[in-house]
Amino acid sequence: MTGISTIHFLRKTIGFAAALSFATAASAQDIVSFVVENHGKDDSNIPATFGSVFVRGDLPKGASLSAQANGQPVALQLDAKATHPDGSLRHGVITLSIPHLKVGGRTTVLVQRASSAPPPAPAVTIAALPADFDAVVTLKFKDKVLVASARKLLAGGKPETWLSGPLVSEWWVSGPFRDKNGAADPHLYAQFGIRSYGRGQPLRVEVNVENDWAYVPGPRTAFYDAQIQANGKVVYASGTGIKQPSHSRWRFGFWWDEPVATYVRQNLPYLERARAVPNYDLSIDVAGSALRELADRFEAAPRSPMGSSIIEKYMPETGGRWDIAPLPHWQALYLLTMDPRAYEVTLATADLGASFSSHYRNLKNHQPVTLDAYPKFSTHSNLVGRGPDQLPLPDAGGYTDPLTPDAAHEPALDFLPYLITGDRFYLEELQFWAEWNLSGTDPIYRNFADGLVKFDQVRAQAWSLRTLAQAAYITPDNNPLKKTLLKQLKANIAWYDNTYAKSPSANALHVIPQDAPYDGGTAMAPWQDDFFTWSIGYIQGLGDVDASALLRWKGKFAVGRMTAPGFCPALAAAYTLRVRPSAKAALYANFAQVYDASLPTQLKRQPPDRTLKCGSSELAAALGLPQAGDMVAEPTSADGYTAYMQPALAAAVDGGVPGADAAWRLFQSRPTKPNFSDYPDWAIVPRKN
């Protein structure tokens, strides 16, 4: 078992009643409210640390933050992390000290723009740690023992400060594992995160075991038993041996003594107003059975280090599944319910995403590898081990890693966990995946350091751009990767603008053709293109790059399938559409040609020898649809191709694409619709609504 149940204590909780009371803004100073619950014991001055985004302009540069509950002030510490282009706060880590809260109780905390800065107060320092503080990680191999000690690393160098203030401070130290003679292992590396709420107060310790250096000779799979000791006891023992492939890592966290057992329910309407998360339909009442099924599947899945829990082990696996959507199924459930069970799954899966071999750390600066630092960096199998500019070939030691990453089927594992917790681990995970997505080709095809994703499948382009934009959006301003991520995002949007949105020779269908890979090079998957359209709309909302021209151009494909002359919406969400007559021919010039070429491929039975009128019962029968006016491709499924189209149409409405409002109304008027209460992953609506 990983340390999730010790850092995130909620495995045994069932969840409070769903009805929440969020305070509404009563004055211009009010920003957002949170609900804080006590899942521990009756206590006073209870700390709660969590991440929060801020709507652009809500907390201007130089302004301070304050909090109150029941009209009484609540001590607050803000560690600012990322800002909007106007200098206002975008993301930070908030720590509250709740004066008193009974076990099982909850209180609504209103966060406001302070009228004046709080008086200065001394920050918690390392001197607050217990005199005997240490956390020791021991890795036992067949022929050696390697050890890393937090105490020795604290004594040997200056720690990195992640949080600092009067309520909480957090420090990070790191170093190689060493053998009995003190010799450093060239590959295995330990990180310790130490969060102190003050002398005699709760203390959280996090251990990360890393096997992820890039460009270090001889990368290998490591086989060992692991043990972590702290505060006079063994807090973790691996039991069966751990098999850790190169370019992976794992995490374990624990409380030194008494845990902090507060749970913070985020404010989804505010998150959506900040445009940090997809605009889910807030009218959806998530079924309790969906949460129970999630909890049951999660409990049945292995969660030990190097496991994957309910993440698909083999990411290239095709077909609908829980981890593929704008955000994974469990994150959609979490956002729409704020249920502790979904919260725990959201964090646990983010932890276990570290098990995949998609992690390359730069030995020179200890940051995730970037293409700026290594423009010829590539993880493509044709290049690894093929020269001095390329990565060395790993030695798996006879072990076949069951986990395979894939950009085309990559879940958004880490953005939301970092957003809501502010945990440094999740930030690095997000950065690792963002840069890995750009590396899977010959560097010339991505224009080296630009990191263009045009080389990949359309769905891979969609998900890679999503992850890159999330990393650029939320990486702290002072983080070395911030400028690189923003530059790569802007380079990608510029390429699409020049190739499509602003090109007089761009295709009339407004598709990303990618050689139309279906039906002998004549057809493409509109649902993959819809993923891309949603992603561009999401990127535009995040606000770091102007993607408006691309969104207006791209959204016309979704709108055209609903409203273009000669194209019946019955085929709008088909699995494939014919977009050219032969593999070497030009794309069709209009949607009517696409419809005429595609209709015969969709018929379930040969119709009578007469024209099939759009919206008619005859067409519905020929297509095997439940009712006239329905759309092909799983019209009743909340995880079907019709559902996949919904976020793209919503993005088109948000982007002001001509005809998008009419297309959305027509889409919503179809008689057969999915029930999103069990599966809300694609229940995304226009932000105008």
Which role does the model predict for each range below?
Residues 165-689:
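Catalytic cores of extracellular degradative/oxidative enzymes
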Residues 2-14:
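Bacterial N-terminal signal peptides that target proteins for export
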Residues 23-26:
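N-terminal signal peptide c-region/cleavage motif recognized by signal peptidases
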Residues 29-145, 161-176, 195:
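Alpha-mannosidase-like glycoside hydrolase catalytic domains involved in N-glycan trimming
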Residues 146-152:
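Glycine- and charge-enriched low-complexity intrinsically disordered segments
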